[in-house]
Amino acid sequence: MSNYDALYSQLVAMGQERWAEQLQATLPDKLALESTAKMAGWQSAMQSLPEIRPSRIELKENVTIGTSDDLGDINREELIALLQAFHPWRKGPYNFFGIEIDTEWRSDWKWERLLPHIQPLAGRRVLDVGCGNGYHGWRMRGAGADFVLGIDPFLLSVQQFQVMQRYLRDPQHHVIPIGIEEVPPNLACFDSVFSMGVLYHRRSPLDHLFELKGCLRPGGELILETLIVEGKRETIFMPPGRYAKMRNVWFIPSIEAMTLWLERCGFTDIGCVDTNRTSREEQRSTGWMRFESLADFLDPNDAEKTIEGHPAPLRAIFTATKL
């Protein structure tokens, strides 16, 4: 399993001894070979990755690890095959020793939309909830964040993060396989908390907001991205079944309803800083994510509707401060 000793030490330094002890007791089982049928294959691919020292690392403008020249005699196609063992790659893109990992999502576009509107990350401790493979966490580090902890329950996401961490060797960025419900309540130790693409998957969105609030120190900033619908303060859409072929979409609020939720949960300085209708260019199938994607989820005759006839995905980014 991955060595999280640096994480445990950092949590202790943050006054979170009990959480560090809890993670020490639970993470080994979550990351054991028996935890999923695919873990053995992932670990085999991980161990087969070649030892390469990147001559260049870029995290501020994009995520670039090394150059093609760093490969030397290493077979590029064999390296691609090892990376493909971690298919599907959903969040990115990554430039990995000259190999373009063209992920399903252009996560860099979302980052560019939100970065001008949030508190500067320099020196901050950040929690990234539902972080996927940690792409945005790398960008947070590139923006100067002192410490980034990503949480995501999907083991493939953690394995993809470990692929990058194998070469970046960043002791201040970690991704662990837990959900927000496994985080102890009222930690009050993070300067910034991100929750992007999570809220509408929660059966109790207000409980999720309280969980996020509990992780923040007083005066800390929440950055939340979620699906929204057009409408007034009373407008909240609950799909009667699937939404864009997803079974686990529960509540989609209007901007005004989302603002009210944040107010009722005790946040202040609330703002909707960006809205964006998801495009086929931003979310699509690629050679690195060969399953269905947005084009398959929309009405083929009306791009403003999902395949079920609901409003097509419209996303908003909110910022708010914990009192």
Curated annotation (Swiss-Prot):
It is an enzyme of class 2 (transferase). InterPro entries: CmoB (IPR010017), Mo5U34_MeTrfas-like (IPR027555), SAM-dependent_MTases_sf (IPR029063). The keyword Transferase applies. The keyword Cell membrane does not apply. One of its GO terms (biological process) is tRNA wobble uridine modification. CDD domains: AdoMet_MTases. Catalyzes carboxymethyl transfer from carboxy-S-adenosyl-L-methionine (Cx-SAM) to 5-hydroxyuridine (ho5U) to form 5-carboxymethoxyuridine (cmo5U) at position 34 in tRNAs. This is tRNA U34 carboxymethyltransferase. It comes from Geobacter sp. (strain M21).
